Amino acid sequence: MRKAEVKRKTRETDIYVELNIDGKGNYDIATGIGFFDHMLSLFAKHGLFDLKVVAKGDLEVDTHHTVEDVGIVLGNAFLKAAGDKKSIKRFSTFYVPMDEALVRVSVDISGRPFLYCDLPLKAERVGNFETENVEEFLRAFAYNFGITLHVELLHGSNSHHIIEATFKALGRALDEALRIDERVEGIPSTKGIL
């Protein structure tokens, strides 16, 4: 089983993440940000990851530090749990619709951190969650996991639907890219490392 526990404490946040890549989609999420908890739950459920996230942050300021730092710690947990990445599929693209919204997420478990994000969101907030933090979370996650991540809105207008489709698609794409393919011998790269 590919598992990891990661803790990170700063003056702004105290984050704990427990991850099992080869899980069943069980989750226990408590960040103090209701909408973000919902999104992380969807991510775990649809990615079939067992995920526990406990976060305490300076929410009296805003949600930015907590959301970004969860992305950092979650990215570190995936990096640790993925291990040597032998025999993984490596690439995946997943489309997820939610009503009028259609989002495409493409991942390369490459060791080369990069984020391309084209998610125009009309609402400034969903609940107490600032929507600009979606991109901050994705960037922190991609850079700390060391993956290339492309996230694009193809259609849609409702910010809640767009964000929800994004987290579901990210979970599905990572599930596929991290799957073990017995046909792949060793590292899935001509360089010999990822």
Swiss-Prot record:
Reactions that this protein is recorded to catalyse: D-erythro-1-(imidazol-4-yl)glycerol 3-phosphate = 3-(imidazol-4-yl)-2-oxopropyl phosphate + H2O
Note the Gene3D superfamilies from the entry: Imidazole glycerol phosphate dehydratase, domain 1
Q: In which pathway does it act?
A: Amino-acid biosynthesis; L-histidine biosynthesis; L-histidine from 5-phospho-alpha-D-ribose 1-diphosphate: step 6/9
GO CC terms of this entry: cytoplasm
- A biological process (GO) annotation for this entry? L-histidine biosynthetic process
Q: Which InterPro entries match?
A: IGPD_sf, ImidazoleglycerolP_deHydtase, ImidazoleglycerP_deHydtase_CS, Ribosomal_Su5_D2-typ_SF
Which keywords, in A-to-Z order, does the entry hold? Amino-acid biosynthesis, Cytoplasm, Histidine biosynthesis, Lyase
Q: Name one GO molecular function term.
A: imidazoleglycerol-phosphate dehydratase activity
Family according to the record = Belongs to the imidazoleglycerol-phosphate dehydratase family.
Q: Mind telling me which HAMAP family this protein's record contains?
A: HisB
Q: What is this protein called?
A: Imidazoleglycerol-phosphate dehydratase
Per UniProt, what is the name of the gene that codes for the protein in this document?
Answer: hisB
